[in-house]
Amino acid sequence: MITRVKIYFLFAIIGTIMVSCRKDTPPSLPQGSVNGGKRLVICDEGGFGYNNAAVSVYDPTNNSTVINAYAAANSNQSLGDVLQSVTEFNDKYYFVVNNSGKVIVSDKNFVRLATISGFISPRYILVVSNNKAYVSNLVLPTNANQTNYIQVLDIATNTISKSIRLDGWTEQMVQSYGKVYVTNQNKKYVYVLDALNDGLDSIYVGSTNACIVKDANEKLWVSCNASAANNVSARLIRINPIADTIEATISLQTTQNSISRLCINGDGTTLYYLMNDVYKMDINAAVCPTTGIIAQSTHTFYGLCIDPADETIYVSDAVDYNSNGKLYRYQSNANYIGTYTTGIIPGFMLMD
């Protein structure tokens, strides 16, 4: 996931020269583009502080995108300020709106069903049972000693049922063997929650960490951040979730860049990650690839998603962080397919 601190500073700079914020009129939604069938749901973060977060939808069937799908389904209402991520469960979408401190629940046609408030600065949501989900929260490194929590969400009543103290900037989560593994952007641990009783444990990984995915062997891959100041290279580590131990460490041979997005293909055998360029790595590899399969070039790569069915690669482009973004589509061998327009700052993507 893109390190939000970098984005905050970027917006602080950009904000001094912004004089207006364009508000597009939501289009009519073509039948088939957002109603049923396979589609890519794109979280358009919007400008920080501008309350213009939106949802774009790419439909592979007619090879087109619909911008402002949520607004069009909800009387032109905005989702709020900074749409961080989305999760699907039981034919509902859970949109995590970071700077608005809320989660919006909608049906598959993007019609709002509920708004859940009371979060600190929510990042990601992970559903662990039919009535329970965890929500991670952001605390900036400058406030590293501030108390932070993982919120427990009752998805039957759409309320926060409990808060679990977990200091630092909690980020992505994945479930394995009845446990939930939580990355942390300003702590050198991956935290482990018992999904049944919320008991807390941790695994020391040696550096701050951001992304996590589960492979075909039920092993967990975590992206550990680089630190030029401490001469620490970015790394991928593999965790055995039965023993909760690190069983492999792969250096990415750079102290200047960190992985911003980490994905895995549908059968869980190939990792894809974004570190300026797009990289591809087999889960059995002993070393990292030295070159990417898709070069960033003059673009501003920001989001990454892999179609679990056919391994189509989707890469989003934030362009200038102020105007509409772009979506690039590639075959699994990196052959270019097409370019599509999205809303402002397309980030997290979900193939549904």
PLM features: residue spans?
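Blade-level signature of beta-propeller repeat domains, shared across WD40, Kelch, NHL, RCC1
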Residues: 326-328, 332-352
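Bacterial Sec-dependent N-terminal signal peptides
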Residues: 1-5, 11-40
